[in-house]
Curated annotation (Swiss-Prot):
EC number of this enzyme: 6.3.2.1
Subunit details: Homodimer.
HAMAP family: PanC
Family, similarity comment: Belongs to the pantothenate synthetase family.
Residue sites binding ATP per the record: 51-58, 166-169, 195, 203-206
Gene it is expressed from: panC4
Main location: cytoplasm
Protein name: Pantothenate synthetase 4
EC category: ligase
Length: 302
């Protein structure tokens, strides 16, 4: 079911709950704690938030939601609040008909695809604080504030029990989890592993911008991460050196950052779980990727 504004969304969600009241919910039988936390004992509702141009990565999020919830809501909205000056807001791919086909294939109950969310733009916004000032935030000031404002609004409108986000956008996931914890949102945030092409390239809606040659060059990102992960037993300096060697040898890759960070707060790591994150431009397209790894506990982080 496609809905285009807040009133239609409210009506669709009410209709879902009414329909469920006369039929035993299927997924709730094994939903565990999520079912117990479900509002007013209604069926478990999940949301997957997207900007459209859906690909297999989004489909994996929808499948994960479908497996855990009785009701699945997908949102499709290109959020202007998270685009800065000179970024690709105007040319970001918009493929609603194809997106609806993906949602139908994956069993989505409601697709919320509004033309606008905030009109006029909100005076009061969520802020990512220090989490939004590093890594992506250093290159894209205000990006995470705009993202959190939209995510917070969607959580309020959809009222989900579960919210699914991809681990490829690691900093986004960290910020969302912190917002949910700090502001007491009644929702469980679930990260889903990065979907990759057979050759290792992380799936992204922006991959459509790449020429055939640039797509080959972009493989340096995932190869660098793999090299870094393979060196993790030797400590943080070895991880960064191995990954940097791959990037330095690559043609057509302009690296923005390559860093190790803590998976909970993006701070320096001294050992244990860590994220190795990379951002680079290939041609005019900015790509990000990351990998989780474990550092020796006696090794000082970078």
């Amino acid at each position: 079911m496609l809905v285009r504004d807040r009133a239609e969304l409210r009506a669709a969600l009410v209709a879902l709950d009414r329909a469920a009241s006369s039929h035993p919910p299927a997924a709730a039988q094994d939903a565990g704690p999520a079912r117990a936390a479900s509002r007013h004992d209604r069926p478990v509702r999940a949301v997957v938030m997207t900007m459209g141009a859906l690909h297999e990565g989004h489909a994996s999020l929808l499948r994960a939601a479908r497996a855990r919830a009785d009701q699945v809501v997908a949102t499709i909205f290109v959020n202007p609040l998270q685009f800065g000056a000179g970024e690709d807001l105007d040319r970001y791919p918009r493929t609603l008909a194809a997106d609806l086909a993906v949602c139908a294939r994956e069993g989505v109950d409601v697709v919320f695809a509004p033309a606008v969310i905030h009109d006029p733009p909100p005076l009061v916004r969520f802020g990512a604080g220090p989490l939004g000032a590093v890594l992506e935030g250093a290159s894209r000031p205000g990006h995470f504030d705009g993202m959190l404002t939209l995510v917070g609004t969607m959580l309020h409108l959809v009222q989900p029990d579960l919210a699914f986000f991809g681990r490829k956008d690691a900093q986004q996931l960290v910020c969302i989890r912190r917002m949910v914890a700090d502001l007491a949102f009644d929702v469980t945030v679930i990260g889903v592993e990065t979907a990759r092409e057979p050759d290792g390239l992380a799936r992204s809606s922006r991959n459509v911008y790449l020429t055939a040659e640039q797509r080959t060059e972009a493989l340096a990102l995932s190869r660098a991460l793999a090299a870094g992960a393979a060196a993790s037993a030797d400590g943080a300096p070895a991880v960064l050196a191995a990954a940097r060697a791959v990037l330095d040898a690559a043609d057509g890759v302009d690296v923005d950052y390559l860093e190790l960070a803590g998976p909970e707060d993006l701070g320096p790591v001294r050992g244990g779980p860590a994220l190795l994150l990379v951002a680079a431009r290939v041609g005019t397209t900015r790509l990000i990727d990351n990998v989780s790894l474990i550092l020796p506990t006696d090794t000082q982080g970078a």
